[in-house]
């Protein structure tokens, strides 16, 4: 369940979400029962204890509300405060954040007492403002900040906090954003140093939930056995996935000699064994693969043949003709070797399977070989030293790259006239003598788009508005 779910006048809460909420019962400031989403409550207690050490005492006046609860509150406000006040201060059913269980109306105890009504509550704004700087450390944001009414559609509510998780909360509060702005504007590239075990999809799913962003994708699958960089695009950065996927990739591979498996790696079943000859000329054989050739795709891969993935054929025991792809081995060198294994580094083009490369090398060596370890160390201009672990993300200690940092295109800052043209996808004269593609940014360093040369004119390739 995404903690960044957006509920407002334009985005009504769905019944499917309401069925999934895990609620727990606690007491509000009037000692009445109140329900709160479990993780939200756990972090609220941490915030409450932290503030208590600073002599600030807070309590909950409202949390989760059912659709029926919201209808009742709306009608009560209508009767007590009138239509004008109610429409600007109370959400109609299905559009209230309180349906999520993730938001809290908190009260501050002043002179030993909590406020008795809404009028008294509004007089305490200065007390609320003193705690805002602490919210993000516990995963909360001020949901309806001052000066953002045109974005949220709700008047400033100093008492209304919302749990989104520590990582999104830090980004939102540091950028002075609302939740709406975060979900629209936040984008970038996260480089994950994947450990052996999880699938690429597992990592994408983790990143998606940590940031609370659904629009997430990776730029080149790593097998479960493989390690190293998995480049993950978030938000608008997903527009450049195809660019990053097409970049050359560098790997370090470890190879075991004397046996082969059905999957070409040590995760598979052993098919054949052999003795290992002495004095294998591994270095020269590797060097002979510095070329372009047609490589056979391994049976254990996600490549489709007749609408079916190859690994599905393998698992069902059905025969299939394996397709071949043109690949280029740009660089390859021996790093180390012993009597039963060797390690090499290689730089290859898109679509090259290192497992298949090792099988081709083994045929030239005249000995069975199997990949025992694979580390992707570089993809395009992005290297492993720019990577993060999933724990780095969870600990809110990570580096996110901008779109332009991941591309090796020239960057041009344009004036307002050209800015208007770029944002509207207008063709431009190639007055900058661009040879391939160019990244356009405005004077505020905002990324506008990527243009490419076509018939000596510059035309839109990707627009980021």
Feature roles, as predicted:
Residues 232, 253, 307, 357, ...:
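Residue-level signal for inorganic ion chemistry
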Residues 186-195, 201-222, 226-229, 247, ...:
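Accessory RNA 3′-end/elbow-binding domains used by RNA modification enzymes
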Residues 206-213, 231, 320-351, 355-366:
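The conserved catalytic core of RNA pseudouridine synthases
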Residues 1-185:
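Extracytoplasmic cell-surface/polysaccharide-interacting catalytic and binding patches
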Residues 242-257, 320-334:
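Structural signature of FAD isoalloxazine-binding scaffolds in flavoprotein oxidoreductases
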Residues 300-330:
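Extended alpha-helical targeting/anchoring segments
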Residues 137-139, 288-293, 363-370:
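A common structural junction motif
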Residues 243-294:
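Acidic, low-complexity central loop/insert segments
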């Amino acid at each position: 369940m995404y903690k960044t779910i957006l509920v407002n006048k334009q985005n009504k809460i769905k019944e499917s979400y309401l069925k999934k909420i895990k609620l727990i019962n606690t007491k509000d400031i009037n000692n009445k029962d109140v329900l709160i989403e479990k993780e939200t409550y756990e972090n609220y207690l941490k915030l409450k204890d932290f503030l208590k050490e600073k002599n600030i005492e807070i309590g909950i006046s409202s949390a989760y509300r059912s659709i029926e609860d919201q209808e009742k509150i709306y009608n009560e406000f209508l009767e007590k405060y009138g239509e004008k006040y109610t429409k600007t201060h109370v959400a109609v059913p299905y559009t209230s954040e309180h349906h999520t269980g993730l938001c809290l109306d908190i009260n501050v105890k002043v002179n030993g007492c909590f406020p008795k009504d809404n009028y008294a509550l509004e007089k305490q704004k200065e007390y609320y403002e003193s705690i805002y700087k602490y919210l993000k450390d516990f995963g909360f944001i001020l949901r309806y900040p001052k000066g953002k009414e045109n974005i949220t559609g709700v008047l400033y509510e100093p008492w209304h906090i919302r749990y989104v998780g520590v990582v999104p909360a830090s980004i939102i509060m540091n950028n002075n954003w609302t939740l709406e702005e975060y979900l629209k504007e936040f984008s970038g590239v996260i480089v994950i140093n994947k450990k052996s075990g999880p699938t690429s999809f597992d990592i994408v799913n983790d990143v998606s939930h940590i940031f609370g962003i659904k629009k997430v994708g990776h730029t080149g699958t790593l097998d479960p056995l493989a390690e190293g960089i998995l480049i993950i695009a978030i938000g608008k950065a997903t527009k450049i996935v195809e660019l990053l996927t097409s970049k050359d990739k560098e790997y370090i591979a470890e190879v075991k000699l004397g046996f082969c498996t059905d999957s070409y790696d040590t995760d598979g079943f052993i098919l054949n064994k052999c003795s290992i000859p002495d004095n294998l000329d591994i270095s020269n054989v590797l060097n002979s693969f510095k070329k372009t050739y047609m490589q056979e795709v391994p049976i254990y891969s996600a490549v489709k043949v007749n609408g079916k993935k190859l690994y599905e054929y393998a698992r069902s025991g059905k025969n299939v003709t394996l397709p071949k792809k043109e690949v280029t081995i740009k660089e390859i060198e021996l790093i180390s070797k012993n009597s039963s294994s060797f390690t090499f580094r290689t730089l290859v083009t898109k679509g090259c399977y290192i497992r298949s490369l090792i099988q081709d090398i083994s045929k030239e060596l005249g000995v069975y070989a199997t990949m025992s370890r694979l580390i992707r160390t570089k993809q395009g201009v992005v290297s492993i030293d720019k990577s993060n672990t999933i724990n780095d993300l969870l600990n809110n200690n990570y580096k996110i790259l901008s779109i332009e940092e991941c591309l090796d295109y020239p960057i041009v800052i344009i004036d307002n006239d050209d800015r208007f043209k770029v944002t509207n996808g207008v063709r431009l004269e190639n007055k900058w003598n661009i040879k391939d593609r160019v990244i356009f940014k405005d004077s505020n360093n905002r990324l506008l788009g990527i243009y490419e040369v076509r018939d000596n004119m510059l035309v839109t390739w990707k627009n980021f508005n």
